[in-house]
Amino acid sequence: MIREKVTVSTRTLQWKCVESRTDSKRLYYGRFILSPLMKGQADTIGIAMRRALLGEIEGTCITRVKSEKAPHEYSTIAGIQESVHEILMNLKEIVLRSNLYGTCDASICVKGPGCVTAEDIILPPSVEIVDNTQHIAWLTEPIDFCIGLQIERNRGYILKTHHNFEDGSYPIDAVFMPVRNANHSIHSYGNGNEKQEILFLEIWTNGSLTPKEALHEASRNLIDLFIPFLHMEEENLHLEDGEHTIPLSPLSFHDKVAKLRKNKKKLALKSIFIDQLEFPPKIYNCLKKSNISTLLDLLNKSQEDLMKIEHFHIEDVKQILGILEKHFAIDLPKNQF
């Protein structure tokens, strides 16, 4: 366990990890402070950060199991101590860490007797198990235990749908939430108009992320939410007599395209985000992971730069070039492949 003495800066806004410990392979704890803040700022940041930590961070789960030997979810299989339902619940608890995009397949194939644990899961290279000792099933007889698994990376939670059980495929309620809990508290100091605040933030994770990693990802997600407001252009708004409201009329995507074609200002480039460019999910996720969020970011990359992105192929680059040509009649610098 690491614990540091809390020292408060009186000038520059600073954050610091003041306590960090690992209670188990599946329970990490971290405590952070941010100071000095003006009165009211700590609560604003604390509420937003807690919501982002609990709801905006992606996690990886087993979402579906396939077995030809199980007639239904509540059946039992000869030679296995647990029912099918109990095995599904054990698989639901497996904690995974990954840089996966979308879904992938995994499997278990073990011969009894013996204990089946998370260590027996055959995974793709992009996925790893946090705790290999997690129990899945007990095989009491010399039988073959072979099942297929679907693994998915997402956020929030997804409730299983009760259909398509005839092929031996069983969906699992998935909780894509690596942060188990998050709390914030506020300490005030100073007098009168000089009163300031310290924000204390506590984070518990399931081991797939450290609290510091979770804090970084939550902060990045919050920043992404506010970026559009930084790039809004000021427009001349006129009020008629008796009007007390100003209608906001942000540029539509097609307006931005027209403006880009006309003068190609950096401001227009910055205000077009890649989620507006009709990219397939794989391309969009890969670009976001590489910190490419706007059209300006993309145009600053060459074709060779894009080919260096993990999981990217020449077909993906060609698709990006086609979309840029379609909407903007522009191209990325060409390289020889």
Curated annotation (Swiss-Prot):
Q: Which GO terms describe its biological process?
A: DNA-templated transcription
Localization per Swiss-Prot or TrEMBL: Plastid, Chloroplast
Where in this protein does the record put region Alpha N-terminal domain (alpha-NTD)? 1-233
The alphabetical list of record keywords is: Chloroplast, DNA-directed RNA polymerase, Nucleotidyltransferase, Plastid, Transcription, Transferase
- Which Enzyme Commission number(s) are listed? 2.7.7.6
Q: Which NCBIfam families match?
A: rpoA (TIGR02027)
Subunit organization:
In plastids the minimal PEP RNA polymerase catalytic core is composed of four subunits: alpha, beta, beta', and beta''. When a (nuclear-encoded) sigma factor is associated with the core the holoenzyme is formed, which can initiate transcription.
The protein's name is DNA-directed RNA polymerase subunit alpha
Lineage summary: Eukaryota, Viridiplantae, Streptophyta, Embryophyta, Tracheophyta
